[in-house]
């Protein structure tokens, strides 16, 4: 089987380009918005989008084709403290379309991860309403980029709080999920966390609702609900993606020494070799986000450690898993 089936990616910020003031999370404070007007917010979004384009071009030139877009790219969208917060992204549609076209033509996978305020299991109706708005905003950006679940694009969300009763909260989560518009439901992907919802809490929900499950290996490792990643369990996880004809997505990091449990490491020096066996074992491709502070530096470090670089006739770089790793068995 072709071993060019594992891709590595990173989230939100390019640490190299950040040194040149290229980043996508500019957010003017409310006082500035009120004094300079809402056009200033739109100018900020344009700057964020242009820098997103630069990051994707950087990724392409370095053979990185998996990236999570920052949720901070559209500041104050839906912020109830601002009178004009109901703006939409249509003012930037041409730039967004250009970015998406470039990314799709070059085979990039783009995803997003709405923040902790998305709580579909909340017992507060206003929190749920705002969660719907937040999810719609994220879905709209992906759609304007030309991406959908058919491109394996997803909106990663956590189970959220337990509100004193995990079982009841999960039932509320499922009920509210079913109320979401179809376009959003198609993008939702559940991820385990290290505190409230482990793999066995969320995987059955995913299987019931036909939602892909994003395995966060690090969260499981440091969780009080930690479980062994057996072949049987991995098959269940992979199947939540395969039945949707989507490429499985996982997250990996390490614990940063001296910080709170669950704090992502600054860098990564090695990957678990069992990950390299997944494509052959389950006949699937696999994309892995490295959730680390040095971002693309760890991605490239791991690519050069475990993969061979291949340059096509058109000058595009691709990373092929080294035979030393691709041939290893269980």
From Swiss-Prot:
Statement: the UniProt record of this protein carries the keyword DNA repair: yes
Keywords: DNA damage, DNA excision, DNA repair, Endonuclease, Hydrolase, Nuclease, Virion
BP GO annotations: nucleotide-excision repair; response to UV
DNA damage keyword on record: yes
InterPro entries: UvdE (IPR004601), Xyl_isomerase-like_sf (IPR036237)
One Pfam family hit: UvdE
Main location: virion
Enzyme Commission number(s): 3.-.-.-
UniProt subcellular location: Virion
Enzyme class: hydrolase
Molecular function via GO: endonuclease activity
Assigned GO CC terms: virion component
Function statement: Endonuclease for the repair of UV-irradiated DNA.
PANTHER family: UV-DAMAGE ENDONUCLEASE
NCBIfam families found in the cross-reference section: uvde (TIGR00629)
Family: Belongs to the uve1/UvsE family.
Protein name per Swiss-Prot or TrEMBL: Putative UV-damage endonuclease
Organism: Acanthamoeba polyphaga mimivirus
């Amino acid at each position: 089987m072709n071993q060019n089936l594992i891709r590595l990616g990173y989230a939100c910020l390019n640490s190299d380009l950040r040194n040149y003031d290229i980043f996508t999370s500019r957010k003017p404070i409310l006082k500035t918005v009120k004094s300079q007007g809402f056009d200033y917010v739109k100018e900020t979004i344009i700057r964020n989008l242009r820098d997103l384009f630069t990051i994707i071009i950087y990724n392409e030139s370095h053979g990185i084709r998996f990236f999570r877009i920052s949720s901070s790219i559209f500041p104050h969208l839906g912020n109830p403290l601002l009178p004009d917060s109901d703006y939409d992204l249509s003012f930037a549609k041409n730039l967004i379309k250009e970015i998406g076209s470039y990314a799709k033509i070059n085979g990039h996978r783009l995803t997003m991860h709405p923040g902790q305020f998305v709580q579909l299991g909340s017992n507060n109706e206003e929190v749920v309403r705002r969660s719907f708005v937040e999810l719609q905003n994220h879905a709209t950006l992906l759609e304007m980029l030309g991406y959908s679940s058919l491109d394996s694009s997803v909106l990663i969300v956590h189970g959220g709080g337990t509100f004193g009763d995990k079982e009841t909260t999960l039932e509320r989560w499922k009920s509210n999920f079913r109320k979401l518009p179809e376009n959003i439901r198609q993008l939702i992907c559940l991820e385990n966390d290290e505190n409230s919802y482990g793999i066995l809490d969320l995987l059955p929900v995913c299987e019931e609702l036909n939602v892909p499950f994003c395995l966060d290996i690090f969260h499981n490792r440091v969780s009080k609900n930690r479980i062994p990643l057996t072949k049987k369990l991995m098959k269940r996880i992979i199947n939540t993606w395969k039945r949707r004809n989507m490429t499985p997505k996982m997250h990996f990091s390490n614990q940063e020494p001296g910080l709170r449990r669950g704090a992502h490491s600054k860098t990564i020096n090695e990957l678990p070799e069992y990950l390299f066996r997944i494509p052959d074992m389950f006949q699937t491709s696999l994309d892995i986000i490295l959730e680390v502070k040095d971002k693309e530096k760890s991605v490239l470090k791991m690519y050069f450690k475990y993969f061979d670089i291949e340059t096509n006739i058109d000058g595009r770089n691709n990373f092929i898993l080294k035979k030393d790793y691709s041939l290893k068995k269980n």
